[in-house]
Amino acid sequence: MAGRLHPRFGDRLVLRQANFRELATVAPGAGFARVDGALFDLGLSRYQLADSKRGFGFRAGGPLDMRFDPDRGVPAVELLATLAAAELAALFRRYGDEPRASRIARAVVDARRTAPVSTAEDLAARGERGGPPNPRQPRRTHPATRVFQALRIAVNEELDALAEGLAAALDLLRPGGRLVVLSY
């Protein structure tokens, strides 16, 4: 999609694939000291979710990596294999707002005693075994959705990267410039 935009805008549009936290170096490297606007798209693409080698979604399955850049950071499988139940529960609560965080974390730790929780299917099953969701709330999503979100945010240090990127974007904006953040 991005490639289709370039002919329309020519040299007024510069696209770079990088982490938000790299904006302070990427923009000057592309010749920008000041900009009129910046766009941050915080969403996952359906291609990332469907890629079974990445482990972003439980529907696609595959190994639990969850890194946006497979050459950086610690994959989700390592966090699941090494963090204590209390640390996992805190992670699920902080980044996923998961009300069953402690039960799911215990299910992960119990399961890894016999075999590693190494695939999206394994983690989805732990999410389901963490106990039923609140019966008074309608169930619109898979029980492991918030756990997957929490792990992805932790693996990619998304909140820290976003904070650094937003600060850099504000420094780059000309007076009257616009910063647009897409989040859904």
Q: Which residue ranges define each predicted feature?
A:
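S-adenosyl-L-methionine-dependent methyltransferase catalytic core, i.e., the SAM/SAH-binding region
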Residues: M1-Y184
